Amino acid sequence: MLLFQDLRKDIYEIVSKRFRISENDVYLDDTGHSDITIRVFRILKSPDGGENAVMEIVRSISEKDYVEKALSEGGYINVWIKRTYMLREVLESIEKSGTYPDVFQEAERVSVEHTSANPTGPLHIGRARNSIIGDSIYRILSRYGYRTVRQYFVNDSGKQMISLYTAYIKYGGPITIENLLENYQKIYREMEKDQSIEKEIEKNIERYENADPEVFGTLRKIAGVMLDGIASTLKRIGIEFDEFDWESDLLLNGSVRKAIDMLETKEEDSARYIEISGKKVFLTRKDGTTLYFARDIAYHLFKAENSEWIIDVLGEDHKDHAKSLNHVLKEMLKLENRVSFMYYSFITLETGKMSTRRGNIVTLQDLVDRTYDEALKIVNEKRPDLSEEERKKIAEVIASSAVRYSIIRVSAPKPITFRWEEALNFESNSAPFIMYSHARAASILDKAPEPEQSYGMDMPKEEADLVKAMYVYPYYLKDAAQDLKPDLIAAYLISLVQKFNDFYGACRVIGTDPLTYARRIRIVKAYKQILSDAGDLIGIKMLDQM
C-alpha cells in the first residue's frame, strides 16, 4: 500500500458523514481549474440538502490545513490545495525514504499471467501487446506494494505443439528455431492436401497424454528451444518471468484429471463435457485426451493455491473462453480468490491477421530491430561526439522504451497501429520525449552546487504547476493499480514532462537567489526521481545523457 494521504478519500469522508455519495464523485480535476472536484448535484436536489448544505460542506473542507480555498460552483465543489503542502509532502518523502510515495508491502499475493503464447514460433507484434501490458501491470502492482509473481503458462500439450512435434519427426533436421518453424509451416501446407496428417497428429496427442517417453522427451526439447527464443526477445524489452508453468506437468501429476472429476460432467460419444448457459463445453475428446479448457481450469486452481488475486491478460478473442472459465471457477467450484481478466485489442497490419502457421508474420524481434535502426540514425545525427559503442547503447534503450511506450499509451481495449515517426518523436508524446526530459534534469543537477538547508516558498505559476504534477503521482499510481490501467501512467508521464518543460523555460535554477535556488534544485531532484520511478512502471529506462 502506498504511504500517502489521499485527499480524495479525506474529502469524501467529510461529505459522506452527512450525505450518501460515491467515492467516484470526488476526483482530481484535470482541467487545471482546481485540484479536486466534488459532484454535488444530488445533494443540491435531495430533501435534506440544498444550497445551505453544500455551503456547510464547503466550510468543513475549508477548515482543513491543506486547503487553500473551496468554492461551490454550479453543481460542483472545487477545492484548491496549498502548493506548500504539496511540496512538503513530496520532498519529505524523498528525503526520508528516497522515493515518493513510500510504500509498505501488502499481505495479498497476486499472480499476473501474461503472454503464454504457444511456443510454436517467434512472438508476433500482436501478441507482444499482451506481454507489454502484463509486465506493466506486474510493475505497477509491485510498486503499489503487492507481492506479485509473473507467470507464463506453457501450452506444450495442445494440438499446435503436437503438430510441431509431428512436423519435426516427419521432416527431420536439427532442433533449431529456424528448422522447426520451417517444418511447422510445411506441415500445415501439406495438411491441406493430405488428410492423413491430421490422424498422425491425433495419434501423437494420445501418445503424449499417455506419457510416451519418446514423444514427451522430444517435445520438451522442442518447446524449450522455441520458448528460449520468445524469452530472449522479451528480455530485450525488459520483460522476464518468475515462473514458466508447463501444461504437461499438470497432466502428468494428475491435476487436470482431478479438476475434471471435481465437476459434474456429462458424456457424448465418450467425450466429457459440462453445460454453461445451455451450451456444451467439452473437457475431453472421445478418445479421452483432454482439451485446453480442462487444462486451463487445472492451471487456475494451481494458481489459486498461492495467490489471493489472479490476473489474466488476454486478447479480446478470448472473451468467451474467459467468461466460461470464470463461471466454472466461481459458480461451479466456488473459488473464493479474486479473478480478473484484462482484455486487449490486437495490433493490426494491412496484410491482415498474423499467423505463425503460414509464416505471414511481423515479429516483435522485427519491430525492435527496425526501431533500433531508426533510433540509431537519430542518435548518430544528434550525438556525433559520442563513441560508436555509446551511441548503440543509447539507441538500444530508446528502441526498447519506444516500443513499450507506443503500445502501452493506448488503452488496452482500443486497436493500435505502430508508427515509427510517432514512436521516435523527440518533440511530443513518446518515450524519447520523456527520456530527453530526464536527461535535461540530470544535466542541471550535474552543474548544481549543494543548496542551503532552508528554502523559500514564493513560486511562480510554472513552478507551482510542476509541484502539483509531481504531487499527484501517487493518485495516478493508485488508480492504475486498482483499475489495472497502465495507460494512466503513460498519460501522467507526458503531463509531468510538459509541466517540467514549462518550468524549465520560465524558471532559472542555477544563478538565482539562495532560497529560490535551494527550493528549485530540490524540485529538479524530486522531478528526476519521480519521472524515473513512473517510467519504470511501464518499462521506460531513463538515461542521464541522450
From Swiss-Prot:
NCBIfam families: argS. It is an enzyme of class 6 (ligase). It holds the Pfam family DALR_1. This is Arginine--tRNA ligase. One of its GO terms (cellular component) is cytoplasm. The keyword Flavoprotein does not apply. InterPro entries: Arg-tRNA-ligase, Arg-tRNA-synth_N_sf, ArgRS_core, DALR_anticod-bd, Rossmann-like_a/b/a_fold, tRNAsynth_Ia_anticodon-bd. One of its GO terms (molecular function) is ATP binding. It is found in: Cytoplasm.
